[in-house]
Amino acid sequence: MKINKKISKIIIYFFLYLIFSAHSPWGQYLAYREQHLLIMSTREDAPTYPYSKILVDVINKQLPEASARAARARTFRRVQGLFSTNQMPLLLLSKKNAKALIKGKGVFKKFGAADAKIIYYFDDLVLLAQPSFPDKFAWLLTNAIVKGEKELLGATSPLNIKKITDIHPGTLMALNNEKMPELIKK
């Protein structure tokens, strides 16, 4: 009787182990992030997701190897978490919310500030990049946006906006017609 109980416990633990150690999709998600240029937006900043889909279409026309995709976070908390931990390299927000993210104020007050560099403006929206986003990728992305500007309503170079100091170095190189930088592996 005791042996049967022990055997049944072992079997139950074994099945629980199998269930919880099954192949998780986490590895696939990391691979997906490496294969695609993800541009994050959020439901809580209403105009960002529809515009991110337009932006992705233009980028994929101009730079198909980027394999750009729109990604949408549910909340500002999730946006800050993914962006500040370098899990999402690009983020499209309204100007007001972009400033709040960088300063850790407004809707991001509870979650803290996050470093960001500016890639491009689209009317009231701003495309931000991680400071660690490679200069070469920022150059390629900026070049694709410039080439597709006619399809991007309100696209405005950061060079045309006064008082902008945090432009991504790769973006500056592209806008100043400098040659594409080499990819530096860290």
Feature-to-residue mapping (PLM):
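Short helix-initiation/N-cap motifs at beta->coil->alpha
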Residues: P64-G81, K162
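Short beta-strand->loop
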Residues: K105-Y121
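Bacterial N-terminal signal peptides
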Residues: I11-S21
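Short, polar/charged alpha-helical segment
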Residues: T48-P64
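Short, well-ordered beta-strand elements
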Residues: R33-T48, A68-A71
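A ligand-binding cleft/hinge motif common to bilobed small-molecule-binding domains
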Residues: M88-K110
